Every structure is written in C-alpha cells, then in structure tokens.
C-alpha cells in the first residue's frame, strides 16, 4: 500500500487500531512506579482481604528475582504485610514481632513454596491461616511462643515436606497431631523443654517421614515410633534416657542413622537394637555406658560407623566381644571408639587392642533353666532360660535344627528379650527337645528341655486335659498349664583341666578358678535352679586341652510339688466340709418328714372314729313358752286315751330352736321302752313313768360324748 502524501507515519497493517499520541503520553505519565527491589509485577492484597492485585513490593520488604523472593526480616512487623506479590515463592518474615497468624493471611500466594516465620512472638495460629498455599513445601515456626501443636492449621497443606517447631513452649503432643500432613518428610521437634507428654498415637499418619528430631526434650523414655515405617534419621540426643529397652525402636526397619549423644544412657539391654536392620551409623558418645550386652551389634549387618567415645567403659570379660567386633568393623579408626576407664591398669587403653590374655573369664551360668513341659494342643507355652546378667546372648535350637534368636519370628514361636521361648499356639508337630544356648566371650552353656504336646481328646474336650486346668494333667501336679514333673534328670557336661596344664594359664594368675561345674551351676545355687532341664552343658573356648565328663543325677522338685499338694489338700478339705454339711441337712430333713407323717396319720384316725351318743333329760318348761307347753300336754292326753300305738300318737310340737328338735331320738326311745314292757298290751298300755302329769313334761336331748361326759335319766 502506498503512503499518503504528507502523512507523518506509515499506515498500520489491516486489523490494527491506531492509538493517538496523547493517549500514550497519558498512560506513561500516570502509570504506577515499579518496586524499588527489582521492578517485578506485584499485587496488592490485604491480609484476609480480597483487594485487586498490586504491582509493588511491600514497603517494609525487599524483593528480588522478579518479586519471587520477598525478605521482610528485622522490620519490627506486628502483622504480615498486606501487599505481598502474588508470584512470591520464597517469603522470609523472621525476627519480627508477629503474634497471631490470622485466617486467609496467605490465601493469594498460590505459588509460595517456603514460608519462614521463625523467631517471632507467634502464640496463636488461627484455623485456616495457611489456606490457599497448595505449593507450600517448607514451613518454619521455630523459636516462637506456641504452647500447642496447631494441628487444624495444617489442613490443606497437601505438599508440605518440612515442618520446624523446635524451641517452642509446647507441653504435649496429642494423638494424630500431624495426620493432616501425611506428606511430611522432615519434622523438627527439638528443644521442646516444657514437653511433658507424647501420646502413643502422636505420630500416626506420618508414613512418609524420613527425619525426626526429638533432641533436648527432656525425654525419659523413647516414645512410640512404630508408625514411622520409612524413618531414616532419628535424633534423640540431649535427653535423659537412662535405659534403652528392647522394643524401643520397633518398626523402624528403615532407620539408617541414630544419634544418642549426651543422652545420659547408662544401660542398654539385650536385643535393644535388633529391629534396626538397616542401621548404618550409631552415635553413643558422651553417655554413662560401662559395658554392652554380648553381640549387641551382631544383628546390625549394615552398621559401618559407631561412636563410643567419652563413656566410662569398665574393661573386663564383657567387653571382649566388642573388642573383636571393632577389630573387624573399624580396624584403622581408633579415635571414634571406646577407651577403658577402669580398671586402673587398663585406663586409657583402646578397647580394640584387648584380648583374652588380659582377663580370666568363665562361661555363663543359667540361673533358671528350662523344664520339661506337657501341654495340650492349642494352648500357649513358655520355655524359660534366664541368666544372672544381661551381658549374655540367648539363642534356641529347635527339634528340626533351626536356630531361633530374638527378632526371628516363626508365626507362632518367638524368643523374648529375656531369653524365653514363647509359643502362642502349640501343635503336635512342636513336640521335641529344645536347647537353650547362652553365650558370652568365654564360651557358652546349654540346657535342654522336652515339650510334649498331646492332641485334643474330642470326648473330654470340656474336661481336664493333659497338663490342663484339672488335677489329672499328665506328669504334672494339679494339672496346671506348666505340667511340672516330680523328678527329672540333669546331665551336665563340664571341662576338667588335666594335670600339667596350669602352665598354659596367663601370667599374673597362679591358678585359674574352676568354671561352671555341676556343683557350681546346679548345686551351689538356689534349690529350684536345677529344676528340670533334660540336659545341660558348658563349653569354654580356652587355649587348653580338656576332657568332657558327664555327671547325671536326679533332682526332686520339692518346692513345686509341695506347694501344689498343699493347694490340693486345701481343696479336698473344703470339698469334704461342703459334702458333710449337705449330708447333715438331708438327714435332718428326712427326720422331720417322718415325724410330720406320723402326726398327720394319728390325726386322721381320730377323725374317722364315730362319736358316742348320750341322752339328757331336760325340762321343757325351761325351754318352751306357754303355748307350746299346752300343745304338748294335749298331745300327751290323746296318747294316754288310747291309740293304736304309743309311738304313732305322740306328736311333739315343732320347736323354735333347732338344737332342741330331737324328736326322732325320742320316738326311738319310746318304742324300745314299751316293746320291752309285758304289761303294756295293745293301745291301753301305761305311759312312760313321769309323763302322767302334764305339769312335768320331759324332753330327751341327745349330745356328743365330746360335749357331755355323763348323763342320768
């Protein structure tokens, strides 16, 4: 297209609008200035508000890299600035006076990855304070005044990887305190000096956690860390962990580094580290350790670096295994490791330089050997094997030749930390001889016992079983679950030094005291110490020839049987008393029933006996009124005038009183009297005596013998 004549500018392409020069000048004059920190585009948004985006950096802050980094440190801020650029990725608000983090303070910072609020005066974080931060990766809140873990404030931080809460006056960590942020990989809870309580479920949900700091929290026990299945680094330094127990690190199979410096640890029990299969570095420096259990580090196949310096190690036979382990693991590094503190002759010596020539050691002694056990299939069972010290290691050999150690698990069978072989549910296939092997630096001692498992009798399943809860247990007293036998045979295999072998003993000792012999192990201890192992042996790998001898003797188990028999006698006495009382009550009831029956029989006989009748003559005038008396007299006159029969013409008046109406008895009496009189004849016979006078009427009254004893007519 040709340019028009006199036109100052070339024509615009088709579809483009032409801006007047005045409009462009107006926009240039009134556009807002760029931020002092680098001219990045920013948005203006008040905390918790919804104002439109601003293009400037906050006045109290400095911005760089196109406002993606905002630094507001040491500006005496009491609140979070309102106009933080929307594209900020790094926000530093450390060393200010911020006290409260309010709801939706950062909701417009969707690209924020690192938020530093450390070294403020934050005492409260409102619910929803971190809403709108889907990209937040690191949240630093250390050196503040928080008294509780702001659990609900972490609701929507789906990408949070690091959380720093160290050096806050937090007093307790409740259950599921961090389950809203399962993405956490690093959690710093160090220097919580007012911490008093950690819930058993405090760390539930942190399945991705790799690093945990609980140092300098005044902990007296290691909290439950089972849920941290992916934990790799654990800091426990600066606490007061006097004792490390077995199971303290249960479930931490991925842990690679464990720091326990300055933790006041004095004792580490046998099998305490058995769960740490992946451990590579262990720091136990600056503690109060004097010795370690035999083969403590043996299960730690990946352990490469161990720090044992600055501990008051007591160098004796218990540290020989450690000397051998150090020679194999860190042969050249002697600066990191233990040096003897006692005895005085070995003070300052590196433990890795010690050997058997410096000590006189003996094989371990089994204080509580296993006993033969008779149980029924399906029951739980235990075979105990305890020593007098925790500096030894305990293993078990099963009937099929499998070696069982603490930590090895066969579904139903396990070795507990005290050396006990535990069966949760025995089967008939478990029957056999089990051997306990106790080992220290000088040798090992074994003791065996037989486990007899009987099948369940379907007929007597509900009754007493072999070794069960009844008195008929096989080979047991009282049939308890222990199934103790009355007598058992102990076979002890010992080592006896041959003549002339004393010359091979180390210098500085005239004669080596004897090792564990039959009298020393079994006879010299408590009476119950020899109660029942089927066999026991002691071996010591010393540089001298030895001849094994066997001694067998029978040991009565008196303490167990006497107690069981005493309990059985008490039960029998109680049973006899109950039976006697029942028999006496039954006898008394029978006697009372017989007596009652006899009394009732006599009463029935009395009732069936007919009553004796009597006749009583009473004066009618006393009983009847005048009208009735006249009627009686007239009737008497008619009778005396001659009737056919005296009994048929004697009409007695109806009496008003029922108890005087006895005319039937009167008629019968008259008939009997005149029939027996020969001079009476026909109808003109004489009347009865006393009836000749109408003025003396008589009436016969009958009554029971019970009421009338004697009557005269």
Swiss-Prot record:
One MF term in the entry's GO annotations: signaling receptor binding
In this UniProt entry, the residues modified to Phosphoserine are 693
Question: Which SMART domains does the record match to this protein?
Answer: IG, IGc2, LRR_TYP, LRRCT, LRRNT
Assigned keywords, A-Z: Cell membrane, Cell projection, Disulfide bond, Glycoprotein, Immunoglobulin domain, Leucine-rich repeat, Membrane, Phosphoprotein, Repeat, Signal, Synapse, Transmembrane, Transmembrane helix
The LRRCT domain is annotated at 311-363
According to the record's subunit comment, the protein's assembly and interactions are: Interacts with PTPRF. Interacts with DLG4.
Q: Where in the cell is it found?
A: Membrane; Presynaptic cell membrane
Query: Which BP terms does GO give this entry?
Result: positive regulation of synapse assembly; regulation of postsynaptic density assembly; regulation of presynapse assembly; synaptic membrane adhesion
Q: What is this protein called?
A: Leucine-rich repeat-containing protein 4B
Primary role: Synaptic adhesion protein. Regulates the formation of excitatory synapses. The trans-synaptic adhesion between LRRC4B and PTPRF regulates the formation of excitatory synapses in a bidirectional manner.
Q: How is it modified after translation?
A: N-glycosylated. O-glycosylated; contains sialic acid.
According to its UniProt entry, this protein's organism is Homo sapiens
* Disulfide bridge partners, by residue number: 385-436
Q: Which residues lie in Low complexity bias regions?
A: 528-546
Residues assigned to the Extracellular compartment are: 36-576
Q: Does the keyword Phosphoprotein apply?
A: yes
* Residues carrying sugar: 224, 283, 333, 374, 400, 422, 425, 444, 452
Q: Boundaries of each LRRNT domain copy?
A: 48-86
What start and end residues bound the annotated signal peptide? 1-35
Gene (UniProt): LRRC4B
Question: Where does the record place its LRR repeats?
Answer: 87-108, 111-132, 135-156, 159-180, 183-205, 208-229, 230-251, 254-275, 278-299
Region spans: Disordered: 497-551, 694-713
Q: What is its main location?
A: membrane
What sequence ranges are listed for the domain Ig-like C2-type? Answer: 364-452
Is this entry keyworded Phosphoprotein?
A: yes
In this record, what's one Pfam family? LRR_8
